[in-house]
Swiss-Prot record:
Descriptive protein name: Putative pre-16S rRNA nuclease
EC code(s) of this entry: 3.1.-.-
Source taxonomy: Bacteria, Pseudomonadati, Pseudomonadota, Gammaproteobacteria, Pasteurellales
Superkingdom per UniProt: Bacteria
Gene3D superfamilies, alphabetized: YqgF/RNase H-like domain
Residues annotated as transmembrane: none
Keyword Nuclease tagged: yes
Main location: cytoplasm
Keywords of this entry: Cytoplasm, Hydrolase, Nuclease, Ribosome biogenesis
Function statement: Could be a nuclease involved in processing of the 5'-end of pre-16S rRNA.
Gene Ontology MF, one: nuclease activity
Record GO biological process: rRNA 5'-end processing
């Protein structure tokens, strides 16, 4: 069980990396603005600024898996991103199964604001929030 930790979660993508912050006390997460990326390479300065602002105890990176639990081509890229986060910032990083989070995020956004609300940045941020909330559930 986790007591009073702050966590940041990332939904890795080649063009955009969703981000969310959460607290273990409530087990909830809030979407933050997504980071732009070029072919999976983020603006590390922006990520560093976010880490300095929130001072997380742990980072959680969504791990994309096939529905049967096997790894896909993108899985190794997400692992590499997680390793780079740890290497650059020295913060503990854990991976969390992210199957269906993008679908759930799109459904949630559509229910709130309809088709026009479905922009990529919002989807990525809410996906990261769902990843973090499922990580909290796994550790409660």
């Amino acid at each position: 069980m986790l007591m009073g930790i702050c966590a940041l979660a990332f939904d890795f993508g080649t063009k955009s990396i969703g981000c969310a912050v959460g607290q273990s006390i409530t087990g909830t997460a809030q979407a933050l603005p997504a980071f732009k990326a070029q072919n999976g390479i983020p603006n590390w300065d922006s990520i560093e600024k976010c880490l300095k602002e929130w001072k997380p105890d742990i980072l959680v990176v969504g791990l994309p898996l096939n529905m049967d639990g096997t790894e896909q081509e993108f899985t190794s890229r997400a692992r590499k991103f997680a390793n780079r986060l740890h290497g650059r910032f020295g913060v503990k990083v854990e991976l969390q199964d992210e199957r269906l989070t993008t679908t759930e995020a799109r459904t949630e956004i559509f229910q709130r604001g309809g088709y026009k609300a479905l922009n990529k940045s919002k989807v990525d941020g809410i996906s990261a929030a769902l990843i973090l909330e499922s990580w909290f559930e796994r550790h409660s």
